[in-house]
């Protein structure tokens, strides 16, 4: 009965109620995962750990709960996370095991060996589909080996995790072969996505291509002083509170802005590809979402990736609201209005995106589920905090802030995306009045 009520609440989008009930009746991988997430949201990590260990003992084949259990192990004893995936069952678990060894236990050689094993079993016919880890393995192996053959194959996939450093490395190969037109085209594409990026600009100037492509670069609308905080690779095991406390001590008058994706990662709500599948409804609605539109067509414009995002919308907002949003979209098109779908499904679902930083390029990242509670904990020592969603193309959006933050001023101060992009590893920016 509890499970049935939880499922009904989930269908209508009463997510927090559903999570509490799923924790009491974890009868499926989905229910157990969301139940554990709900416990973690409430600060009950020990209860979440107990729930995940119990379902793991009965249902070792459940993939979502297994990866969430690994998250909790990483925060306590990373070696247990490795043991959880030893031996790995299938290609995705080989990727996960390699990531755990390489990024968390710093046993780089062992991690690379597992990536190579997974690479040898790759199905290249479906390499552009989201649930094929080809793009992830190529990115990892290119970074650690600098193999030009692998890098060229990675570039040919035309994937959205081919980022600034990858572009610069590939352009170097093209230039060394005298293929300057292709090198220029690749950099041009990079500038479309990362406008004004210093890494790409330096490469462009070094090759003597003249004026940088004139894609409109957003500028800050204030005279605020911005200080980028280099954090290195933040992980689900990072202590964000101590980082915020240190930054606040160094800049007591500034507003500490944190990327919303970082908040979601710390909440544990990452949706790992390879652990779940899109539903029939998600596959049906996916091709109509228009994901991936733009000047350049990348693999993520394929309906397959869109279906995964719609599945995330369904899980976060509920089937009812997604159907209602789809109806609102049809009505909006008749009335020549845009944005009605996201107005219905809400900001948490709207924020869903695929991460590009290893090892989180294997995830869909929703908006923070309980951002008000999260920033209240981070601000316990007096820091003024804003959670933001900023990129080069669309500018800045303020998700929420602690009391006393002028959000309009802050939004204008961040319009030019001073944090940069993935390879910059500066997801925290302190903004101070002039």
What residue ranges belong to the model's regions?
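Short coil turns that delineate tetratricopeptide repeat
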Residues: 26, 60, 89, 123, ...
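Start-of-helix register in tetratricopeptide repeats
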Residues: 3, 30-34, 62-64, 92-96, ...
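Alpha-helical segment of the N-proximal tetratricopeptide repeat
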Residues: 2-20, 24, 28-43, 174
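Alpha-helical adaptor scaffolds
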Residues: 33, 37-40, 67, 71-74, ...
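Alpha-helical repeat scaffolds
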Residues: 16-24, 46-55, 78-88, 108-121, ...
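"A position-specific structural signal for the A-helix of alpha-solenoid helical repeats
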Residues: 4, 34, 68, 96, ...
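Structural motif corresponding to the intra-repeat A-B loop/turn of tetratricopeptide repeats
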Residues: 12, 42, 75-76, 104-105, ...
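N-terminal and secondary-structure boundary signal
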Residues: 205-434
């Amino acid at each position: 009965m509890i499970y049935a009520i939880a499922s009904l609440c989930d269908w209508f989008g009463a997510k927090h109620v559903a999570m509490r009930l799923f924790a009491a009746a974890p009868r499926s991988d989905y229910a157990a995962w969301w139940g554990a997430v709900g416990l973690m949201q409430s600060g009950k990590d020990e209860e979440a750990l107990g729930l995940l260990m119990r379902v793991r003992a009965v249902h070792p084949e459940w993939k979502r709960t297994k990866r969430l259990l690994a998250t909790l192990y990483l925060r306590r004893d990373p070696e247990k996370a490795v043991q959880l995936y030893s031996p790995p069952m299938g290609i995705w678990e080989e990727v996960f095991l390699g990531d755990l060894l390489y990024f968390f236990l710093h046993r780089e050689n062992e991690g690379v060996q597992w990536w190579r094993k997974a690479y040898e079993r790759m199905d290249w016919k479906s390499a552009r589909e989201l649930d094929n880890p080809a793009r992830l393995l190529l990115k990892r192996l290119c970074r650690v080996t600098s193999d030009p053959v692998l890098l060229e194959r990675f570039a040919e996939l035309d994937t959205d995790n081919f980022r600034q450093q990858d572009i610069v490395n590939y352009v170097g190969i093209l230039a060394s072969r005298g293929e300057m037109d292709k090198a220029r085209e690749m950099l041009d594409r990079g500038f479309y996505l990362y406008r004004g990026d210093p890494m790409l600009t330096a490469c462009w100037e070094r090759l003597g291509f003249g004026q940088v492509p004139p894609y409109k670069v957003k500028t800050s609308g204030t005279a605020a002083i911005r200080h980028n905080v280099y954090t290195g690779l933040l992980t689900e095991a990072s202590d964000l509170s101590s980082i915020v406390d240190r930054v606040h001590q160094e800049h007591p008058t500034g507003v500490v802005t944190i990327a919303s994706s970082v908040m979601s990662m710390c909440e544990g709500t990452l949706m790992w590809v390879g652990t779940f599948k899109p539903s029939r409804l998600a596959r049906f609605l996916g091709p109509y979402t228009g994901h991936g539109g733009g000047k350049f067509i990348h693999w993520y414009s394929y309906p397959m990736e869109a279906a995964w995002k719609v599945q995330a919308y369904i899980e976060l907002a509920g089937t009812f609201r997604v159907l209602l949003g789809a109806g609102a979209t049809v009505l909006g098109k008749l009335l020549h209005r845009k944005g009605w779908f996201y107005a219905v499904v809400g900001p948490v679902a709207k924020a869903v995106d695929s991460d590009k930083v290893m090892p989180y390029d294997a995830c869909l990242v929703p908006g923070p589920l309980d951002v008000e509670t999260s920033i209240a904990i981070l601000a316990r020592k007096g820091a003024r905090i804003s959670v933001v969603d900023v990129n080069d193309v669309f500018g800045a959006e303020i998700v929420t802030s602690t009391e006393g933050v002028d959000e309009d001023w802050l939004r204008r101060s961040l319009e030019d995306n001073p944090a940069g992009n993935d390879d910059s590893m500066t997801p925290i920016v302190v903004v101070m009045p002039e």
